[in-house]
Amino acid sequence: MLKLLSLMVPLASAAVIHRRDANISAIASEWNSTSNSSSSLSLNRPAVHYSPEEGWMNDPNGLWYDAKEEDWHIYYQYYPDAPHWGLPLTWGHAVSKDLTVWDEQGVAFGPEFETAGAFSGSMVIDYNNTSGFFNSSTDPRQRVVAIWTLDYSGSETQQLSYSHDGGYTFTEYSDNPVLDIDSDAFRDPKVFWYQGEDSESEGNWVMTVAEADRFSVLIYSSPDLKNWTLESNFSREGYLGYNYECPGLVKVPYVKNTTYASAPGSNITSSGPLHPNSTVSFSNSSSIAWNASSVPLNITLSNSTLVDETSQLEEVGYAWVMIVSFNPGSILGGSGTEYFIGDFNGTHFEPLDKQTRFLDLGKDYYALQTFFNTPNEVDVLGIAWASNWQYANQVPTDPWRSSMSLVRNFTITEYNINSNTTALVLNSQPVLDFTSLRKNGTSYTLENLTLNSSSHEVLEFEDPTGVFEFSLEYSVNFTGIHNWVFTDLSLYFQGDKDSDEYLRLGYEANSKQFFLDRGHSNIPFVQENPFFTQRLSVSNPPSSNSSTFDVYGIVDRNIIELYFNNGTVTSTNTFFFSTGNNIGSIIVKSGVDDVYEIESLKVNQFYVD
């Protein structure tokens, strides 16, 4: 069963024109005077998925952690004047202490011209002042530089802006642009610091940026963020769609359980694929470290100091992951995000295989970006836009439009595709801080129940908030099914005010697929928009090649995130009920007898303080 991770850390008036020569502090002040960030949430607006109170939002940009103030910062594509995409497009800004509840900050910066866009980019912390933008008055932990795309007059170029106040206001670099290849499809730079394997190397900045309509991710290096050298390109890999967007390259922990045999004071042997290059000795130690195929591993023995047995240990190495979004042309229609697992030597990325891997198998998960840094400098955290360009401008919300996904923690793990094949996968788990959430008394557990067609279980919520988590473990008796019968386990998430509006999700044994039906709504958009796919499914193999399946879900008013098999498969989708019709009950049923057993169903409803 998947567990939520607790993070380990101690609008604008239509008359406002966001221009470079405008005073950004004044813009922020005016925004704050016309928007009450502490006001209660709209009835259908998500509570723990970030969304601006007003205006349009799309791709996440510039994610970083302020170690001085212990604040998390996200920026995003933002048009504050209407709930649809428009120009001038700016960078919005929000801050959080816990990655769960966000404080909206308004516009961080924007382009000079009203017909221009400050398109997507990233944020770095220039600790060592390689750019020369800072002096001793700015704490090294707050020396943030934004690298972003200016889209204007048929050209896309890369720009720099820097902040002297911890990311709240920005000054544009006077010698912009820092990269111009005479292209109208050259965008979305993601920058990180590359140190290399040699701890004595000076290191340098690395940028991935999309040459969108050529299906290329260009890889540049720089000593100072201002002067860039093209090193290589990663091109025409995986699923192309119409064009590449929002690339990113990140070093991700690789975690694998394997078998070891040992005795106190002696050598250790490992059966795993990432075993030591040479013999490793220890004496009553609870942890060791080794190198395997030049991949550093930090090993923690599962039985602490009692090591005189054969048991399991957790191998932790790393691999590099190239993330590429594409739009349109996803296999589900519209927007999609894929990734490649491989190796990076500072100039070139090489995937380990030709497998195309999709980051999320739902309809509403796009443009993932990872945080530049985290408190322990090991965790890889990221956030995506929870919408789809096929219909994002038309979804029935007002005065805001669209939300972000939950923050996720990423690791590379092994995944049983079927009983004979194991592959690597980018595993993801949601990050929420429960200290920001409180139960409202609705907590329900259902255990050891065999379903039949003549009865069903009903879970009633008290004072429905529309925000809850659920964890479902179930087993399937495959010997008792007929292939001509729709053999379902179904959960109906029904609206409290109108039960004709509901989500239906569950599993069908013949197809071995988990399904979601989001089409039962009275909202015209849901019924009439042909791109708002009503019925979706994902392959859901059992856990550890057994007959037991598990799914964890978070429902947040108009969005549902599903995590299968401890996060090896995910599906993120929006849904839309009538205003204020929060989910008030869950009905569990099956159309067949003695096929499904509910081993455990746990539901907790939350308020947000």
UniProtKB/Swiss-Prot annotation:
Q: Which residues are glycosylated?
A: 23, 32, 36, 128-129, 135, 227, 233, 257, 267, 277, 284, 291, 298, 303, 345, 409, 420, 440, 448, 452, 477, 545, 566
- Keyword Plastid on this protein? no
| BP GO annotations | sucrose catabolic process
**Protein name from the UniProt record:** Invertase
Note the SUPFAM superfamilies from the entry. Answer: Arabinanase/levansucrase/invertase, Concanavalin A-like lectins/glucanases
The record's family statement is: Belongs to the glycosyl hydrolase 32 family.
State the UniProt keywords alphabetically.
Answer: Glycoprotein, Glycosidase, Hydrolase, Signal
Name the gene for this chain: INV1
- Read off the PROSITE patterns from this record: GLYCOSYL_HYDROL_F32
Q: Which SMART domains match?
A: Glyco_32 (SM00640)
InterPro entries in alphabetical order: ConA-like_dom_sf, Glyco_hydro_32, Glyco_hydro_32_AS, Glyco_hydro_32_C, Glyco_hydro_32_N, Glyco_hydro_beta-prop_sf
According to its UniProt record, the EC number is 3.2.1.26
As given in the record, the signal peptide range reads: 1-14
Q: What reaction(s) does this enzyme catalyze?
A: Hydrolysis of terminal non-reducing beta-D-fructofuranoside residues in beta-D-fructofuranosides
Q: One Pfam family, please name it.
A: Glyco_hydro_32N
List GO molecular-function terms, semicolon-separated. Answer: sucrose alpha-glucosidase activity
**Chain sites annotated for binding substrate:** 56-59, 77, 119-120, 187-188, 245, 389
Q: Which residues form a coiled coil?
A: none
One GO cellular component, as annotated: extracellular region
Please name the top-level EC class of this enzyme.
Answer: hydrolase
List the catalytic residues: 59
